[in-house]
A protein has these predicted regions:
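Conserved helicase motor
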Residues: 197, 217-224, 236-241
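Conserved C-terminal RecA-like helicase domain
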Residues: 93, 122-124, 146-147, 162, ...
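Conserved Walker A/P-loop ATP-binding site and its immediately adjacent core
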Residues: 167, 183-209
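Short hydrophobic/aromatic beta-strand immediately N-terminal to the Walker A/P-loop
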Residues: 155-157, 191, 385
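Walker A/P-loop NTP-binding motif
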Residues: 106-111, 165-184
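Conserved pre-motif I regulatory segment
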Residues: 61-157
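Signature of the SF2 helicase/ATPase Hel1-core->accessory helical subdomain module
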Residues: 129-130, 168-177, 233, 237-374, ...
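Charged, amphipathic alpha-helical stretches
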Residues: 1-64
Length: 469
């Protein structure tokens, strides 16, 4: 029978390492493993200083499976120990959500197998790839085999807001612990690689909060007394092929480093940063964290580069808690995309922008109506954001020849000054027929502002709205 030709793959279909760990628990997907773990009651420790999630996971193991309860206990005690260490100076101790705990547990399992016998791990991954993964209808079947050289790179595809930074801190300790147990070669440096100086400063403060020795990278410190004793933070723009006034040659770091990469593909053009990471970890190891691996691959215009990146992250991604899982668990945001047919229609533009303000007002009224929203869920007051493509430059779509930011400021000025006109827009938007239609003939805002239409907005508010927004 002829081999079925697959269409262009998506990264989520190619996460063979992630599924290799899942099958050790007898599960084919994250939902099957986590179904009974999501209750917040399972967060934190029991009276025996063991993770409650560890005990729940023990119930999922089958007697003849590859993982034992003793192994899970060993891994859990590492996680508990390292969590205690980063909690030492915190007023509010960290309690891992199920997806954070599983990220750390998967890391324990992987590092144990990697340090114990990398050749055996490589063999087991390839056997799983050929005997299981490539026979699933929902997976991508064209990944190349693993080599031992592939194994010193791990990636975590975790959504923004899911706690990637705290995982990084524990990952450092996990790697150091297994390197100690297996008498691995001493690391030259521990490096956190960021896309910019702002994120470098943020990592510095967060590592300090986790009670970890940390320093901002300095050219003068290369080869200095404190080399390897602290986590060093450097943004990718300070690395170069040769030394410069503000840059240091990547060769100066040697190759036996532990490198932790935060959103690396956002910091340097092309694949330069990936080459630097490769040089930094030739004899070492790297952990990489991003919410946008899939988008980064799709953005590659060169087919060869896209495939290389696709294969690399397909084989390196240890845990997938990307946005679809994040959203399904009740995090993230609901959104609507409403494109305007004609940017040059002032009446249409005013209607759309007024609708935006009305939406913000509606959310604010609901927020103020019940303080339990804040007290129980720690939700802050709604925030409105305008995102434009230009601050100084003139937007080509804009007939008034002003920047996007100026356009919004002019709208807000008109909104405040012309109360009668914009009160009319508000009344139209709150009526059953606003006059705006989609291409299919449906009302654009017909199903919007249901809370206001249902009574949150009294008649006096319609007049006060223009004054107080």
């Amino acid at each position: 029978m002829a081999k079925k030709i697959q269409k262009k793959g998506k990264l989520q279909q190619a996460l063979v390492l992630f599924h290799y760990i899942l099958q050790l628990f007898g599960c084919k997907d994250l939902e099957a493993l986590s179904r009974d773990l999501k209750d917040p009651a399972y967060e934190g420790l029991n009276d025996d200083h063991e993770s409650k999630l560890y005990h729940e996971l023990c119930h999922k193991l089958y007697a003849t499976g590859p993982l034992s309860i003793e192994q899970l206990y060993f891994y859990d005690q590492h996680i508990v120990k390292f969590t205690d260490e980063i909690n030492e100076k915190r007023s509010e101790p960290i309690k891992w959500k199920y997806f954070q705990y599983l990220s750390l547990l998967f890391t324990e399992i992987y590092l144990d197998q990697y340090f114990s016998n990398p050749q055996a791990l490589c063999h087991n991954l390839n056997r799983f790839l050929h005997d299981d993964f490539n026979h699933r209808a929902e997976t991508w079947h064209e990944l190349p085999d693993f080599t031992v050289d592939d194994l010193n790179k791990l990636a975590y595809w975790n959504a923004t807001g899911s706690g990637k930074t705290l995982l990084m801190h524990v990952n450092i300790k996990q790697y150091q612990e297994y390197a100690r147990i297996h008498h691995a070669k001493k690391l030259n440096r521990i490096i956190v690689l960021t896309p910019n100086e702002g994120l470098s400063r943020q990592h510095y403060e967060e590592l300090k909060a986790s009670n970890m020795d940390v320093a901002m990278f300095s050219k003068q410190g290369v080869g200095g007394l404190f080399q390897g004793k602290a986590v060093e933070i450097i943004d990718i723009n300070k690395l170069a092929d040769k030394d410069g006034d503000k840059t240091v040659a990547v060769e100066a770091f040697e190759g036996n480093n532990l490198v932790l990469v935060d959103e690396g593909h956002k910091g340097s053009s092309g694949d330069v940063w990936m080459g630097y990471r490769q040089k930094l970890t030739e004899e070492g190891f790297s952990f990489e964290y991003s919410a946008t691996f899939g988008q980064a691959i799709s953005a590659k215009s060169n087919a060869k580069d896209r495939k290389a990146m696709f294969d690399q992250y397909g084989k390196a991604t240890l845990f997938d808690y990307s946005y679809r899982y994040f959203y399904a668990d009740g995090y993230g945001k609901d959104y609507r995309i409403m494109n305007m047919n004609d940017w040059n229609d002032d009446d249409l533009l005013n209607m759309y922008l007024t609708a935006y303000l009305l939406c913000l007002y509606e959310q604010t009224k609901i927020y103020q109506s019940d303080m339990r929203i804040h007290n129980r869920f720690l939700v802050e007051k709604p925030l409105g954001i305008f995102v434009g493509s230009s601050v100084k430059a003139v937007s080509k779509e804009n007939k008034n020849q002003v920047s996007d930011v100026t356009q919004i400021l002019l709208f807000l000025q008109d909104f405040i000054r012309n109360r009668t006109e914009f009160s009319g827009y508000i009344r139209r938007l709150l009526s059953s027929e606003d006059g705006l239609k989609t291409k299919n003939g449906y009302s654009v805002f017909g199903n919007s502002f249901l809370a206001l239409k249902g009574g949150y907005l009294v008649e006096d508010d319609k007049q006060k709205f223009a004054e107080n927004i």
